[in-house]
Every structure is written in structure tokens, then in C-alpha cells.
Amino acid sequence: MDMKTKDSRTSRYREVYARWQRDPFGFWAEAAADIDWFEKPKKVFDPAAGIYGRWFVGGVCNTCFNAVDRHVNAGRGEQPAIIYDSPLAGLKHTLTYHRLLTETQVLGGMLRDLGVGKGDRVIVYMPMVPEAVIAMLACARIGAIHSVVFGGFAARELATRIDDCKPKAILSASCGLEPGRVVQYKPLLDEAIALAAHKPQSCLILQRVQTQTSLIEGRDRDWAQMRDHALIHASSAFDCVPVEATDPLYILYTSGTTGRPKGVVRDNGGHMVALKWSMKNLYGVEPGEVYWAASDVGWVVGHSYIVYAPLFHGCTTILYEGKPVGTPDAGAFWRVISEHDCATMFTAPTAFRAIKKDDPQGKLLAQYDLKKFRTLFLAGERADPDTLIWAEKLLQVPVIDHWWQTETGWAIAGNPMGLGMLPVKPGSPTVAMPGYDIRIVDEGCRELPAGKMGSIVVKLPLPPSCMPTLWQADARTRESYLDEFPGYYKTADAGFKDDDGYIFVMGRTDDIINVAGHRLSTGGMEEVLASHPDVAECAVLGVKDQLKGEVPCGFIVLKSGVNRPHGEIEKECVALIRDKIGPVAAFKIAITVARLPKTRSGKILRGTMKKIADGETWQMPATIDDPAILDEIGSALKRKGADAAVK
């Protein structure tokens, strides 16, 4: 199947995008009719509200109602809502919409009994289990604001989030599961609360069979015991709490360019409208079909496309607690797709690079029947053409790259399967979705011609679902996203458009690197390395990695007088990052160098160092202080075996 020969004339995309351009507010008013409102919005968009305007002002709704109740009310309660498939736990079970409603009502009642109400924050620090999804929905049901933190994140990172959003309660579990090991969550949670200035009133702990943990009297409650008690009391069955469309649904923290995380806020109304629209028009999925986002609920993909969008659309969503390889082999994804009749899958290119590495010929696919499988979507990092083409040839279905951010909550650019597929250009996530007016500009905010690389920006206002602000940080939002290019949202990505309007995203313009689809701050890692008593200065940059796309590589300069073995200090630095940021950083390369290359003004030449590490051609920077240092960097990389040529 050659995706490049598709005829764009068969797609309705141009017509739909033009309709949005002609009447953007009418377009989104029509999309909003697919949502159940308690009170319809008074204004589709109010340009005077918020920092760039707000969507569906005056509308009253509830996210949980649209994800669960409406389907039960429509007589579809016996349809599967969630398929839980955990090769790590050796468990599989299905929750119908009716069962999901019951569980969400019960947990909502439990949260109310813990004193949680409308507008209160709740941190969800959990593994990939159904209770994590139920926790998110239960918060939405009672009007509380959830903040999901990736299970197993380091205690210090969790503590900063506790202090920023000040949760009334934390929902967690005794442990998470990784291949060959159990990750204890409770000690991390206890340490985080000890580190944090803010103390939650209560913690609700799910005891998993793999580990039973001790509970702190007066603060911790046993999930199962409290659930059993709540089930006996009929008061747990209650209606959804009405909230404003502009009220926050959740806060999701993403890496900032400093050590302080950014709490991206998602509102209720716009989030539902955009995600519901995307399921049919972008992903081409119908209600009742099985949809699988192979991600984690701790990341934005998990929020939008494991939990909310499939449930808004009345689909069956797969919650997979496993890996693309090693649980048990590189055929794991094919088993899940085959066994559960999955129609559409969404994952990061990293997963397919791992499968390709373990099973380059795709021989394990022959064991499975993927008869219902129609489309594979990739996002979270740049999809390299080799991986995309390999997956397309193996699966014989369209493989669609698309591009978006934690801040937007859904695709900025994609190939809209529901409107008719456009020709694929490997390396491009295709075209702007309705709602996004994408421009490529230079440093002076002047628009650049086709083929010219520049900063990718989006003309304001951003569409529904995009963040209205960062949590209690309007000034920081303006500074981070709006001030540099007045009238535009700064994506902090660089790229270009071609003559057909296709967008090519080439990389980040700030210090955020993308490790296996996870956005991580090199600045944050540098802060940690600099805290080592023997380190004088350091630089962390993302270097190319065949499996993860990018991995961080740290260069450290030791303080004078330090005469300990370099290898010993480097191991301590690796352990320090693991402890302070977590294994998700994938930080394994620390290299001791005598000095770092800098400009005469003292700025570290990270871009040139990255090119050397990646084996790319580079030019001597005109502003360099001492050209000989770059040769020293190259030699240090070769000694460590960390340069691209050695890899």
C-alpha cells in the first residue's frame, strides 16, 4: 500500500479547513453540539476573557457525564468501556460503561468523604491500572481538579508538584510494575510529602497483590476497605456536579526550561469539544470501535487518548500495562491488537524502533490476525522516515505521523483519516488541523517563504482544548508562550512548510529534549549535576539515539583539586539524575572533560557540541573563545564510545 500516491482530491480536508477559516466561531459552535450541556454556552468565544480569550463562556457541563453517563443513558451500558490488559501483572479484564459508572460514582463518594469538593486539587500518582482512569473520572464527576503524576516519578519531582497545586488528597498505589521488577511507590510518596511544604489531608492507597505497604495512621486510607464501605452506602450514587466550561478539569505538569515545572491547565468545555471532534475527523474512529493509545496516563497522550477522547466518543479504550518488547517479546503489540479487535492504535515512534530492533523482519506478526486494524498513528516525538516506512510495509495500513504538545492537548497538525486521507510525506505530520493557523517566522516575527526554516508559531486565538494558562501563573504563561511573537503562540519548535502547506517539524528551539516521547529539560538535569560536590560546571544536551530518538549526555568539568577516579564521579552523577529526576530521564552518559566550549561572552556552545556528538558536519563558531576545545570534546566522546559514529 503506497500512502504517497493517495489523491488529495478525495479528501474533504481543504473544504473543512476553509470552512473553519471563514467562520471559526460557527465551526466550533457546530462541534459543540456533539457535547451534552446542562446549560448551553452564552458565547462561543470571549476575546476579553483570560489572557487570549476563552471558549464556550457561560456553558455549564460535566466531563464525567459526557464520558460515561451519557452512554449508559443512551442504552449502551453493556458495551465495553475499558479493556485492561497487563502482561506484567498477568491480568486481563473488561469494564462496561455501566460498571465504569458505578465505580466512578463510588470513588466520587469516597473523595467527598475525604473532604474533597468542587475546585479542590487531587494528585493521582498511580500505575497503569483501571483505578487510575476511575480516579480521573471521579475527580471530574465531583468538580475536583486532578493532577496526574507519572507513577514512579522521583520524590523531589512529586514534591514540587504537591507544593504547586496544593492537593487536598493524593490517590496512589503500593507499587508499579516494570519488566523483572516491582517499583515501590509508597516510599516515594512518603518522601515527597516529607519534602513538600504543603501537606495533603489524606492519601488513598491501592494495595496491589505484588506489594502490601504500611499505612500512616490518620493520613492514609486503604482503597479496598473504603470502597467496600462506600458500596454498602447508597449515598455513593449521585449526579455529576455542574461546572463552568471554563473551570479547570486538570493540571498536567510538563518540563519547564528552569527547574520549576509548568502546570498546564485544561478546561472542561473546550477539551470535550475538540477531543470529540478529533476522534471522528482526525482518527476516523466510530463509536463502539476499539481504540488503543499505547502510552501512560501520566502523559498528555494518556489523558487525551487513553481516557477522555475514546470515552467521549463511546469507544472501547485499551489500558495496557506492558511494553512493546520484553512482555514477553516484540510481538506484544500485535497480540493486543489481534486479541481485542483494535481498529486504531496510537503510540510513540520509540515503541516501533524497539520492535524493529528486536524483530527487524517482523516475523512475529505472522502469529496474529490483525483483521480489524486500520490505522497506526505516531506522535510524541519526530517520526523518522525509516521507522514510518518499516511499519507501513509490515502492517500494510496507513502509518500517520501527527504533531502536538502537552499545552494543546490534541493535534496541531495531522493527516485527517476521518475526512479522507491526504498523501503522506515521510518526515512531515502533514497539515494544520482546523483551529490552528500555523506560520513559520524569523526572529523578528516576519513570515518566511516555503522551504525556509524558522520558528513555528500559531496565530491567536488557540482552538478549544488548548491551555488557557499555566496553573496560577498568567505572567509566566505570557512570558513563556506569547511575548516573543506578539499575536502568536510560540510552539518552541523549529521547522518549515513546503509548497503544499505540509509542515516539517525539525526540532526544539529551547532546552527541552525528547526522550522516547517524554519531554525533559536539560536545564533541570544541569541543575542536578551542578549540585554534585565535585562538579564545577556542566552541560547536558540531547544526542541522537536509534531507540529513544534522543538521550541526554552530560559533560562535567571537575573542581580543581579533585583527584578521585573520573569513572567513580561519573557513576555518581548518573545515580544523582536517577534519584532527583527519575529513570524516565534515561540519563546514562556522563563524560568528564577539562573544559567546556564557550563563546567569548561565556555562553556554552551546546548546539556545536550536539552536532559533534551526533556525527554531523559542523562549522567553527565565529564567537568561540578557544577552538581547540571542540577537538577535546570529540576525543572525549570517542573515548566514552558515546559519539554517533561509535554507536
What positions do the PLM features span?
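Conserved AMP-binding/adenylate-forming core of the ANL superfamily
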Residues: 64-65, 82-137, 154-159, 218-228, ...
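Structural core segment of the AMP-binding/adenylate-forming
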Residues: 137, 141-226, 349
